């Protein structure tokens, strides 16, 4: 028996193709998002380069050994987010420094930086939404959301 539209294989084949198309679209969007950000930085619309330099300069300085106050909700997570943003800026700066305008041709580099950007967005969105709901609805009703945001 050859290929037949009535067999279960037809829907499995179609679903596999749809998944590949969907994944391809995700890959393209990841490249477009970071590519647009870098283009805006090169044109001077977004101050990415000087921020990356500031992060690089702060790393060469003497670190603070002062323990932060972690008494409020998500204080520790916000410190982690701040450090993730520094990593993102360092990688963008290093990539732009190494490749210059040709960074758009370095898809693997762009995809990795884009993944970090997406993770930062997701983590920050979860924290901000949970904080908003925590203030609006109270502590008891948001225990699950707080735990999920802290876990993320």
Question: What role is predicted for each listed range?
Answer:
Residues 1-152:
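Flavin-dependent oxidoreductase catalytic core characteristic
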